[in-house]
Amino acid sequence: MKRFLFIIMLVFIVVMIWVSVHDKEDNQSIPEKFEKAMRLTRMETYHDDDYDYTVRYPSFFEQTDDSLMAKGCCRFSFWQDSTEIVQSTFVEQNADSLTLEQAMTKYASELYATQQQKGDSSFILSGHIHADDGRMTSRRYYAKFVQHRKLWFVQSLTYPEDCEKAVQRLIQEINDWKVW
């Protein structure tokens, strides 16, 4: 009987140790979990039928509807607890026939861009998202604007500041994005 109780106690201790070791993953922060998921996930491809462009997004992102979305727009998001990461694409008319330099200056000013990078037919802006009253928030954006005739194709990513490292794969996808 003593041997049986000893074995039961030993099994109980082993199970408790195993649970405590495997429970550590649940103690990871959301940015750590997201970074791990981004390393392991496969990328899906969305094709826009209206403008014939494609966008790659993580398989665990959910395609979400937005009542303000117009023709040529798509939105993919990840939401857990208070962490929201949104990847979106839209097409905008270049009604003022702005050159690449003029558009970069205009949008950098409107979006309070802290970093700007110009390419051959595109530019990239990034910075903090500002609240309506002008205050900086703890969220950031990264956006690529691609010029094609009288249109701007824009792919953007918004994310919490503490997820900067975790979204690097998505930022690289945006950097590599070609409309056609």
Descriptions of predicted regions:
Residues 19-28:
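Hydrophobic single-pass membrane-insertion segments
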Residues 61, 151-180:
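Surface-exposed amphipathic alpha-helical segments
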Residues 64-162:
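Conserved polar/disulfide-associated segments of primarily extracytoplasmic proteins
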Residues 38, 49, 53, 95, ...:
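Extracytoplasmic/periplasmic, Sec-exported soluble proteins
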Residues 31-69:
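N-terminal "mature-domain start" segment
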Residues 1-2:
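N-terminal hydrophobic targeting signals that begin at the initiator methionine
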Residues 5-20:
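Hydrophobic membrane-insertion alpha-helices, especially the h-region
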